[in-house]
C-alpha cells in the first residue's frame, strides 16, 4: 500500500508539473487595442517635426504621417504629385508654381493651403520666424536656393529660386519637404 501511495503521488506530481509547464507555452495574447497600429522601430523618434528631423529611423515615421508637395514613386526616384496635383516650372528654371489638391486636411482638421506650405518653408529658412526651428543638424540647406515663397491664393504656392536648381523637386520629396499643420506647430512647437 505504501508503494501504491508513493507511485500515485509521483504520477500526480509529474502530471501537475507537465500541466503547469504547458501553461507557459500558451502563446501570449496581444493586448493592443483594435484602433492602434504598432510599428517596430530601432529607437524612439527624436521628433515628429519634419523641419528638425535628420535620423533615418524618424524619416520612416514621418513619411507615414505627413505628405509633401511631391513624393517619390514607389520603387523609383521619379517624382510624382502628392499635396500638389500639378506644377509648372518657368522657362528660366527659377520659378516653381504648385497647384494644391483641394479638400485636403491636416490631422488636426485644418485645411492644407498655400499659406500652410509657405509657413513651413518660412519657419525653416527664416531665422527671425517666430517658430524657426531646424534642429541640431539642419537639412534646410536642401532649400537654400529658395529666395521667396508666395501664397498666390489658397490653392497655389509659388517658389522663387535665386538660380536654376535641378534637384529642387527631388528635395521637396525628401522628408525635410513634408508639410505640417501650422496650427499644430504653433500649439505644440
Task: Indicate residue ranges for each PLM-predicted region.
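Surface-exposed binding/hinge segments that line
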Residues: 118, 136-185
